[in-house]
Structure formats: structure tokens, C-alpha cells
């Protein structure tokens, strides 16, 4: 009895890592991955509810999947953050959902499915515990024809940011043992990954002290078969400074800093229950560029938080103009029930939030155009992500997969996972065109 599953993943790379864990569990229990949702017997939706727009996207995705379910006689399974946060709503308002479970149970997905639907479950996969069989299974599981993979180093968060609902359903910070991280990295590499992205809610919180964090990163970077190591979600504090110095000493670590500041106004940061201020953030960005030549920066800002005034927005604008981060993500603040921020008087209208975001975006786009101009004719280390529509999609080491710029190359002889040099020839608003100059 061949029963197929398909996983739709919403949200951030951390969810992608969780979906890979589900994939592993389902395959181990004898289920088979489907190429398309329509051909699956079980359609999983791994959800996101970080902000209001993410919640709305989740609901729409579930409702759309419910229509597909009716046409294809599937079982619809909703998992992750939305299921953890709104179980009663799913039960009462979306009867099309056959099964739901929250965060922390991804690795048991196969067993959960078998217990819920014993008559629809295939025979459990039989294999011995030899390393060879385990690695063979892992390769089958995690080869998504992508040259990169996400490996979670922890789950949960202890920061207590007043705008963030994640700790309420992800729980307190819990780190993975180094041995488990190394195992997952090795498994992904054996499945074909050339680049490993370490992810978590708060990567720099890992370890009892800075040395534990640095030792974990060193051990991952020392894996001979690893080509590129990328560190994501680096909270802007002192441990990040030490991690940056390690990045400068370690060629395998990508020239990339992702550090979500969320704001630069001291008043707003204090209300958000976050540390740091504009001057320390400037020093952090300057240090990153000093120790890792060619490094590019990705950061994010939440605009329209309660109490934000025009002067606070001006501080964000000045910061962007002075530090010139290559990648800026802007979120419109949406109060999340159960957070401290939701208890504050909402002082900024939705219309004004949009105006402020558009103002900041326009300033950054003007800076980005100048940055693009400086890239013309320059060569960069790069990796081929895919070949589609008679073009290769290539990514510089300065760009993270699935969220940053890509470079389009008119060369279908390139192969996903190939690493070499690319020359930038032209650009769009965000993405670029280029020429592959070494294989």
C-alpha cells in the first residue's frame, strides 16, 4: 500500500528545517513523498503566525488546500505554530482539517499519522541500524535537488521581546547537543548539500557562554566535505561580536551577517524589551565589514510600534543612510494577542505605518541602486541553486537562500551545487544578471 505525503511550508527557514524533520519521520514510517500536493494522500501544511500577515496567509493556504482535498480525497494535516496557537479555532471553524498538532512534534509526524489513520498507513519501513542503511535513508529523505540545507541548533527563545508571540508556543530556549548538530550537518552533506545554514530563533544564545557557541561553530566548519557555512539569526549583542571575529578567521563561513535590529530608537527598543542602541549597532556593522572583507548585511525593522513618532522613524532613516545595509526587511507592526506590545495603546494607524515603511523602503532602494552599480564588473564566489526556464539561478555567497538576491545566468550547462565565480553584468531592483566565469 503506497501512501504519499506532501508538505507545504510557510514562513521562515526554521520552518523549513522542521519540515525536513517531518519528512524524515514520515519516510521512516513507510510513507512516500509526492511531487505535487494534488497527488498526495496526506497534505501537511507547516504554518506560520509570527505576524498578522503570516496568520492570514496560513488561513488562506489551509482553505485553498481544503478545496484540493475535496477534489482528491486527501487527508489535510495542519501543523506548527498556527496549530499550537489556535487549536480551538481549527476544531470549530475549519472542519476540513483531519489532524493538527503543534510545534515540538515534527520528528513524531510519521508515528502520529499511523496512530490516527491505522487503516490508511503503509507497512513500516524495515531496515537495520547499520550506519550505511541510516545514511542511505537520510540521503533519500533530504535530497530536494537543492544545494543547501537548514540545520536547527536550538528551538524556543528566552529574550521576551514585547512584540513577539513565539515563546508562548515555541517555549523556552532549548539547544541541540553538538553531536546532534554535527550528525544533521553530515547527513545533509551526504544528501548533496554544499551549503549549510545554521538556524534557530536566537543562534547566539547557544551555549553557556561565548566559547561554547564558538566551539560548536568551529566543529561544524571543520567538516571537510562542507563547502559553505552560513550563520542566521544573530541577535545584536556581545556574543555576536565574538562570532564575527571567528567568521573573519574561518574562510568557510559566508561573508554574511543577518542581525535583526527591529529598531534603532532607544525609546522604542526599551519598550520592545530589546538591548542595544544606534551607536552599538553601527559599531557591530563596522566590525563585521572590517573582519570579513566583502561581507554584506541583512537586517530588519518593525515599523509602527506603539509610541513610535516621526523622530523615531528619522533615526531609522539616518541609520540606514549611514550604515548602508545591503538588505533591509521591513515589517508593519501588528499587535499579537498575549504579548506586552498588544497591551499598549496603538498610536500609529495602518495608513501611517504604510507611509513610513514606503518612505524607508524608498531611501533604501536608492542606496541599493548605488550598491548595485558598484557591483557591475565585479566577480564573486557563487553557487548554482537551480536551472530553470533556460536560465541558471545563481547565488553569491553574500546572499542567503530563499530570501536574498539571485543572479540570472544564460547558461543551462550549469549544474545545481556547482561552485565558482560569477561576474555581475546588470541588475534589476533587487536581482541581477551575470556571467559564470569559472567552473
Swiss-Prot record:
* Residues binding [4Fe-4S] cluster 1: 12, 48, 81
Q: Tell me which EC number(s) this protein carries.
A: 2.8.4.4
Q: Which GO terms describe its biological process?
A: tRNA modification
Q: Which domain of life is it from?
A: Bacteria
Q: Which UniProt keywords apply?
A: 4Fe-4S, Cytoplasm, Iron, Iron-sulfur, Metal-binding, S-adenosyl-L-methionine, Transferase
- Can you give the residue ranges of the TRAM domain? 373-438
Q: Where is it located?
A: Cytoplasm
List GO terms (cellular component aspect): cytosol
Co-factor binding comment: Binds 2 [4Fe-4S] clusters. One cluster is coordinated with 3 cysteines and an exchangeable S-adenosyl-L-methionine.
Domain Radical SAM core intervals: 143-370
Name the PROSITE patterns for this protein. MTTASE_N, MTTASE_RADICAL, RADICAL_SAM
> Cofactor(s) for this protein?
[4Fe-4S] cluster
Residue intervals of the MTTase N-terminal domain: 3-118
Q: Which residues does [4Fe-4S] cluster 2 bind?
A: 157, 161, 164
Database matches in NCBIfam families: 30S ribosomal protein S12 methylthiotransferase RimO, MiaB/RimO family radical SAM methylthiotransferase
Family membership: Belongs to the methylthiotransferase family. RimO subfamily.
What this protein is called in its record is Ribosomal protein uS12 methylthiotransferase RimO
